[in-house]
């Protein structure tokens, strides 16, 4: 963007300052802080689409996120769709990437993600469900202050409504409410 601004003769200092206010679209990396009883969490919404490369990039992003002393990195993952015969290997193969990125808890939705969930060490398994809608309650119950929660999956895996449920649940709670 800055290269295009420079080519158009725009002042780069002003252009870079303006870029600081651009927010990622919903489902494509939007970050927001939500209130929980113990403080706040950071929600990273990557719910619009997923393929092996974008899933690894999102896990790298989660792994690079700084968490507080009490916070955890939580990945809530839905199926990557339309992968054909390689689907099982591509889903279960994410386990190494998850461990390398110090993800503390993984929730998984969908029949393809079951292969990943089964490949994970027991200590980081949150819950698996056949549908994302069945993870709403377990994810909400697991979250506490300081956590960074990333939600990612193919659009067809319906992770967007889970993001909306998290937003609605935690925005509706006053910061001082009991947990």
Please annotate each region the language model reported:
Residues 2-179:
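ATP-dependent carboxylate-amine ligase
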């Amino acid at each position: 963007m800055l290269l295009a601004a420079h080519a158009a003769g725009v002042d780069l200092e002003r252009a870079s300052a303006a870029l600081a206010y651009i927010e990622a679209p919903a489902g494509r990396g939007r970050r927001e802080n939500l209130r929980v009883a113990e403080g706040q969490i950071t929600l990273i919404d990557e719910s619009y689409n997923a393929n092996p490369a974008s899933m690894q990039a999102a896990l790298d992003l989660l792994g690079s996120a700084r968490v507080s002393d009490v916070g955890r990195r939580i990945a809530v993952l839905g199926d990557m769709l339309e992968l054909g015969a390689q689907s099982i290997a591509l889903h279960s193969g994410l386990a190494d990437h998850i461990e390398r990125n110090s993800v503390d808890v993984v929730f998984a939705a969908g029949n393809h993600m079951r292969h990943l969930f089964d490949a994970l060490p027991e200590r980081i398994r949150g819950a698996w469900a056949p549908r994302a809608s069945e993870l709403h309650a377990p994810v909400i119950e697991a979250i506490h202050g300081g956590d960074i929660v990333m939600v990612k999956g193919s659009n067809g895996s319906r992770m967007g409504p889970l993001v909306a449920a998290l937003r609605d649940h935690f925005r509706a709670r006053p910061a001082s409410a009991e947990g």
